[in-house]
């Protein structure tokens, strides 16, 4: 009898662990929009051309001069400007 109680408790605990946090994330995002915090976060680049100018700069091709700006601009291009 004790084994079945332990098994039931274990199954209940594992079922609670598989709950997704999507509704919580959506609630947080809507709260941020209502409070105005979402509008304060602006992307670094307004266009792909600006990101491309930073990404293909000569400094970004050298390991010694590669900076966070190079990383951010090339990542922006990869995420937003590449054709599928």
UniProtKB/Swiss-Prot annotation:
Keywords: Disulfide bond, Neurotoxin, Secreted, Signal, Toxin. Its main location: secreted. It is found in: Secreted. Residues 22-39 form a propeptide. GO terms for molecular function: toxin activity. Disulfide bonds join 48-70, 55-74, 60-81. One of its GO terms (cellular component) is extracellular region. Residues 1-21 form the signal peptide. Expressed by the venom duct. The keyword Disulfide bond applies. The keyword Protein transport does not apply. Transmembrane segments: none annotated. The cysteine framework is IX (C-C-C-C-C-C). This is Turripeptide IX-01. It comes from Gemmula speciosa (Splendid gem-turris).
